[in-house]
Amino acid sequence: MTRITRHLIFIGILALLFAAGIWQDGTVAQDTKIPALSELNEDEKITEKASLGARTWIIPTPVWVIGSYDKEGKPNVMTSSWVGICCSKPASLMTCLREATYTHGNIMERKAFTVNIASESYAPYAAYVGRVSGRDVNKFETTGLTPVKSALVDAPYIKEFPLVIECKLTQTVELGLHTMFIGEIMDIKADRSILSEEGAPDIEKLKPFVFTPGSSKFYGMGKLVGNVSDLAKEAEKK
């Protein structure tokens, strides 16, 4: 069998897989049927976990609104949920953005960004700024939110959002479709109304919300589960 023949056979197999909806970009096809719980027998309900494929379904994810300036100095914000703390010394966080986003170019240009965390009452604003591009609209003008120029980094933050993290870009990591931006935390600013007696942000006062990939919904934080050290002791007894 010649190399060309083998190549044609391989292409034919791939075409059949695509037609059958079995393979898409190395993952299970989006419309692959996941058995309903009612379709499983009692043993399967206990032992079986459904295979969901290689997806970005980490449940839940934070809702961060990233602030930046474009090269003309226009303030912009966008919502990102692919985010997190990545180092304690120096205190640093990261967010991952596609190159196609307006914010990606802004951060590369200005070497800075802010993270703005909203209370539940501002959920509509977080949803909106994550669905339109700063190339097309001035999001501060359309929402009525107020941009504030940071005194520490070359980026704006949102006055109305109660918790703000100001970051200086220190590293970029190309990961494929997304770029990881690592920012050193220069300062955290918080409305005094959300602080505990100890001076730390109080989650019950802040009332943040989270995002659920797959369903594309925001959820509030719910009730207190318990103190971590107390819960750990309970598990040890069991």
Residue ranges of predicted features:
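Bacterial N-terminal signal peptides that target proteins for export
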Residues: 1-11
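Basic, polyanion-binding surface patches
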Residues: 26-238
